A protein has these predicted regions:
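Intrinsically disordered, low-complexity regulatory regions
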Residues: 2-106
Length: 106
């Protein structure tokens, strides 16, 4: 361990390599994430409503699939992933409440 508890190995890595190592420790391997996220997205696209959805709805669901993948392959207690899922869902909800003025949040 070097100064500030940073391992010598980590200090000698490039910035990109450091970022990838940090992300891998937090989220699991990229290959596992890619496989699970793509499978989840594939399932979502098979739903009968997919072709009726607006771009923001599709994108929100795809990003949520990515966040779910990170949760199940990495640190399930990392609150930021759960927070992000809420955020993307809220963006769609906010748009829908503008065009559905009678909608009352439960």
């Amino acid at each position: 361990q070097g100064r500030l508890g940073v391992s010598m190995e980590l200090r000698n890595m490039s910035t990109v390599d450091k970022t990838l190592a940090e992300r891998g420790a937090r989220y699991g391997t990229f290959m596992d994430n890619a496989r699970i996220a793509q499978e989840l997205k594939g399932v979502a696209c098979q739903g009968g409503s997919w072709d009726k959805m607006k771009a923001d709805q599709k994108e929100a669901l795809e990003v949520i699939c990515q966040k779910i993948s990170r949760i199940v392959t990495g640190d399930p207690d990392y609150a930021d992933n759960w927070h992000d899922i809420q955020g993307y869902a809220k963006l769609v909800e906010d748009r829908l409440t503008l065009i559905q003025p009678t909608y009352v949040k439960a």
